[in-house]
Amino acid sequence: GDTLVSYSGSESTVTIPDGVRVIGENAFKNNDYILNVICPDSLEQIGYRAFYDCDNLQSVSLPETLKVINEGAFYYCENLKTLGHTDDGVLPKGLTSIGVKAFYFCKALEGDLVIPDGVTSLSAGLFYNGFALTSITIPDTVTSMDANGDQFANCTAVTSVKLSKNLTELPK
């Protein structure tokens, strides 16, 4: 089918086959072998905690077609450095939804974070402990931020932030 349900292999580089639209819930959870994941252009959604605690994961090439990154998708991927979009900011332009703590404790994720125009709300704990992020751009399409906050807590290398002019309230 069009959903990758589970991967339990020990390859260091995993190429997800073309035609896969969804990476399922917990599909790669706790896999310490994978270093790189190459996603197909057909990919539209990454499931709940799909890459949870993949300690050695360093890069994931996310296609521009990706629409949804669910809750905790890359939670505790402490060595994740790149999502394959270094020219256009960290995230694919097609994204419309990023779940709670999607990139929680991705402390190696580098560069200038640009939230895509399709996103309207920022979930709690989104880039918590994003120590290597250097700037954050939040487009005017974002009108709310989860009141539980910590979207960018401890992003200590950030030197520049551009906020949406349509945000009426920031979390505490």
Go through each PLM region and give its residues.
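Structural signature of tandem-repeat unit edges
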Residues: S8-V22, D32-Q45, D55-V68, E78-S97, ...
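Lipid-handling modules and contact-site tethers
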Residues: D2
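Consensus positions within tandem repeat domains that build extended binding/scaffold surfaces
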Residues: E25-A27, G47-Y52, N70-Y75, G99-Y104, ...
